[in-house]
Amino acid sequence: GVDSYKKNNCDGVIAFGGGSGLDVGKAIAFMSGQNLPIWDFEDVGDNWTKANSDKIAPIIAVPTTAGTGSETGRASVILNEETGVKNIIFHPKFLPSIVILDPILTVGLPAKMTAATGMDALAHNLEAYCAPGYHPMADGIALEGMRLINKWLLEAVSNGSNIEARMNMLTAASMGSTAFQKGLGAIHSLSHPVNALNNIHHGLSNAIFMPYVLTFNKDVIEKKIIKICDYLELKDRSFDGFVNWVLDLRKKLD
């Protein structure tokens, strides 16, 4: 991708597709002006400061799925095929300059992929809200992202041509990526190695791990989960009620 960028004298990248497509496009824009290997910029410590910031190409992001929210993220997740490890490559300028959210582009997404990417968006919003630390803006964004998913995910899966549902899911996905600047959790910590080793869709593995991680973390997140229940106006506004909501959502999406 970088060779093609240079060969054609490009001056920017339009990253088009799902999370993987967007991440690769962002990585090409980033690496087009770097001399070090991409792995030297893994999101560890201040590695990002090694980059030549002036040589990072501008990025326009056009997502065609509603899951990763990579269009509002400052990183790319790239699989190192030699090690089998999914590495997070970070730089503030990974954040696209322009994002185009067009629900028409997601209408043809199959129901199973709509469900899996939707659960990825839910995991982002949920883990961001439950992450420790004080970030009221991220918390507010995450809560509203979960409300949109609660209202629109099942509709987007069952009626893929519903433009309103598709637009709201795109919005929720972008909100999730924005919110998780606060942090993520064990759902993603468990998912990434499983995805890399077994080629399981990231959203699917998030959905699998979600209720187990919630239960494991009950003692430290219960108060936050009850606030989520209140915001989503669930019938059973308890920790167990929320876990049952997740289980019921998974069952309906299966």
Which residue ranges define each predicted feature?
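Glycine-rich phosphate/pyrophosphate-binding beta-alpha loops
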Residues: G67, M175-N206
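Mobile late-domain/C-terminal helix-loop "cap" segments
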Residues: P211-D254
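Buried hydrophobic packing segments
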Residues: V24-A29, N125-L126, M146-W152, A172-G176, ...
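Glycine/threonine-rich beta-strand-loop-alpha-helix active-site module
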Residues: V2-D3, K7-L101
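Carboxylate- and glycine-rich phosphate/diphosphate-binding segment that chelates Mg2+/Mn2+
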Residues: R74-K182
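Phosphate-handling active-site elements
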Residues: Q34-D43, N199-H201, D219-E222
